[in-house]
């Protein structure tokens, strides 16, 4: 199957956001306020991380299969990890992906994490925006496919719900291409309304109620911005940021960055959602030039 334009746009945006955000980890907290105020991008090169590596696996999987085939996808994630394990994977994912790669059943591996609770990290959410764009014609399918891909690495319901939320937001952004974008509260409320009772849903509802004049720092304080590397601490803020800037990918990235936190992942999520609507329109040419290239197959699908 061929990838849709919104899917590839979302992938390109996600990779740009990932690399853009990750580059700011080299800025000290003392230097950060002035650097952010000046809005000077960090020097090249911008390398992408596990967010993009796993999104690439997911998109290639959809091209080959048309839907999520969990056993195959789990093996493909493990294979990518084995090939480039230095892409800054989260602490728990090293063991998960090594064990799957060694032949263990992904269901057993993921369910054993954290005393049988499973990981509720943001890893399933960080990679999923292109999937939302792929299935954007049917929001029920978006939710189900996002859940299936999440479960291959993350057993905890909050991690799964975070992935579903991001995929739904990307789908709604993709559906709005060429028309009026949904308002921030409108998009966040629509996404939250399709989620099960969870901390992620509560965070999105809180985000939808924040006044229009809310500063980024206040939103990050209220919602969290990934300092805990969890889905509830990451997804509501990233989607709040994206939903307020659906017509400007650069503005979405600068705004998301102001929240600090897990910057590669919050920026990857926000950019993956916004780019499902805008592509890289409006992005300074120097930014994609600074970003590490994606594999050649991306241009062929």
What are these regions (language model features)?
Residues 1-301:
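Structured, active/binding-site neighborhoods that engage oxygen-rich ligands
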